Amino acid sequence: MFFSKVMLTRRILVRGLATAKSSAPKLTDVLIVGGGPAGLTLAASIKNSPQLKDLKTTLVDMVDLKDKLSDFYNSPPDYFTNRIVSVTPRSIHFLENNAGATLMHDRIQSYDGLYVTDGCSKATLDLARDSMLCMIEIINIQASLYNRISQYDSKKDSIDIIDNTKVVNIKHSDPNDPLSWPLVTLSNGEVYKTRLLVGADGFNSPTRRFSQIPSRGWMYNAYGVVASMKLEYPPFKLRGWQRFLPTGPIAHLPMPENNATLVWSSSERLSRLLLSLPPESFTALINAAFVLEDADMNYYYRTLEDGSMDTDKLIEDIKFRTEEIYATLKDESDIDEIYPPRVVSIIDKTRARFPLKLTHADRYCTDRVALVGDAAHTTHPLAGQGLNMGQTDVHGLVYALEKAMERGLDIGSSLSLEPFWAERYPSNNVLLGMADKLFKLYHTNFPPVVALRTFGLNLTNKIGPVKNMIIDTLGGNEK
């Protein structure tokens, strides 16, 4: 009897020790929450940096990154996906040189400028520079970065990607010490204790909530409608077209060969209509939006909503009205100069919409925490700067961490992180403010405002130094 009690007690003790061991947190130097472009770029850049490569790095994402990204990189589809962004040559250079990614260049299109028009007037702004920007699928960036990270040995190179896993809790390892290392609990039951926690986890960032860093901003009560398009022929000029309509800007941006991508900002009601239309009607409206007047477009919206115009009649009417506009041009070649190539079809299942908003965190860091990308800021897509801002955040954070390592500092301390925030916040704030003011300036057809912006746009188009400053900003070459 005594022997049985001893053995039972021993089993309980052994079980208790095993439980304590399994629940002990795993240590990591950097834990990145989010496997989007910003998070993957940061992980790859840390491993590619001579100063940072020995840091134990862990990336967590709720999506199945391995299957999704590996499949895309090894067997890409024969069509372009709808999540396509404009990136600067500087961002491409950083991805390939600092992060070590091998991008799929046959799925990237550089272009030589942007032709901007006001839908309420004849004002134009022709921004031209060779290889000013590139259009690239977000999944191309992610898959290329994931492929690079996969080439590292998990144990030897101290890099782990934990996908299909959510962050369920973040807290300080010592509740009474804000400088203590964060404890991150995952949905798979694992707990990590990290020297530096990086939030690359989007607009609703759990990392930002843990850091208690306030974020300010507003919803625009507008949506961006995206789609991948097939064109009648490749562009005569490799450039993007953007037209500011009273309901919001519409952008037609080139992809390889006779492909293009659409971003059409509109009201919630109009965005629902655009998604509900048959593909042929939607295609016809895109072509009309770059040529016809606002009154014509409003007429089409009304008749489509009340069902009084079918697809065939819509296509016929738009063709008639656009041909009338083309007939007023002095030269037939002006059609290709002023208007984008006609859209002939929409790639199946690429139409989607997303809400538009502006947000900006008060800070990008505190002790043990840094924020990058959408966790720190979101912007209207009209300036095409969202992803570039995130990539520049990562560049700034990597540089700050390298300097901290060179000086023997704790990479999770505010002393190490604040140079990153001090560098990135002012530039991002300017870009966010610029996009917000442009949206509000062009989101009206009030005659005095239209007259003022028409004068300003035409004047800007005539002043070379001002145009060059805009091109430098859009192209990521701002000083």
UniProtKB/Swiss-Prot annotation:
Statement: the UniProt record of this protein carries the keyword Oxidoreductase: yes
Superkingdom, natural source: Eukaryota
Keywords: FAD, Flavoprotein, Hydrolase, Membrane, Mitochondrion, Mitochondrion inner membrane, Monooxygenase, Oxidoreductase, Transit peptide, Ubiquinone biosynthesis
Localization per Swiss-Prot or TrEMBL: Mitochondrion inner membrane
Membrane topology per record: Peripheral membrane protein
Presence of keyword Transit peptide: yes
EC number: 1.14.15.45, 1.14.15.46, 3.5.-.-
Transit peptide, start-end: 1-17
Pathway assignment: Cofactor biosynthesis; ubiquinone biosynthesis
Catalytic activities: 4-hydroxy-3-(all-trans-hexaprenyl)benzoate + 2 reduced [2Fe-2S]-[ferredoxin] + O2 + 2 H(+) = 3,4-dihydroxy-5-(all-trans-hexaprenyl)benzoate + 2 oxidized [2Fe-2S]-[ferredoxin] + H2O; 2-methoxy-6-(all-trans-hexaprenyl)phenol + 2 reduced [2Fe-2S]-[ferredoxin] + O2 + 2 H(+) = 2-methoxy-6-(all-trans-hexaprenyl)benzene-1,4-diol + 2 oxidized [2Fe-2S]-[ferredoxin] + H2O; 4-amino-3-(all-trans-hexaprenyl)benzoate + 2 reduced [2Fe-2S]-[ferredoxin] + O2 + 2 H(+) = 4-amino-5-hydroxy-3-(all-trans-hexaprenyl)benzoate + 2 oxidized [2Fe-2S]-[ferredoxin] + H2O; 4-amino-5-hydroxy-3-(all-trans-hexaprenyl)benzoate + 4 reduced [2Fe-2S]-[ferredoxin] + O2 + 5 H(+) = 3,4-dihydroxy-5-(all-trans-hexaprenyl)benzoate + 4 oxidized [2Fe-2S]-[ferredoxin] + NH4(+) + H2O
Main location per the UniProt record: mitochondrion
Cofactor: FAD
GO cellular component: extrinsic component of mitochondrial inner membrane; mitochondrial inner membrane; mitochondrion
UniProt-reported outcome of changing L382E: Abolishes catalytic activity
Gene Ontology molecular function: any one: FAD binding
GO-annotated biological processes: ubiquinone biosynthetic process
HAMAP family hit by this protein: COQ6_monooxygenase (MF_03193)
Function description: FAD-dependent monooxygenase required for two non-consecutive steps during ubiquinone biosynthesis. Required for the C5-ring hydroxylation during ubiquinone biosynthesis by catalyzing the hydroxylation of 4-hydroxy-3-(all-trans-hexaprenyl)benzoic acid to 3,4-dihydroxy-5-(all-trans-hexaprenyl)benzoic acid. Also acts downstream of COQ4, for the C1-hydroxylation during ubiquinone biosynthesis by catalyzing the hydroxylation of 2-methoxy-6-(all-trans-hexaprenyl)phenol to 2-methoxy-6-(all-trans-hexaprenyl)benzene-1,4-diol.
Subunit structure: Component of a multi-subunit COQ enzyme complex, composed of at least COQ3, COQ4, COQ5, COQ6, COQ7 and COQ9.
Family note: Belongs to the UbiH/COQ6 family.
Something else known: Present with 2940 molecules/cell in log phase SD medium.
Protein name in the entry: Ubiquinone biosynthesis monooxygenase COQ6, mitochondrial
Organism: Saccharomyces cerevisiae (strain ATCC 204508 / S288c)
Gene: COQ6
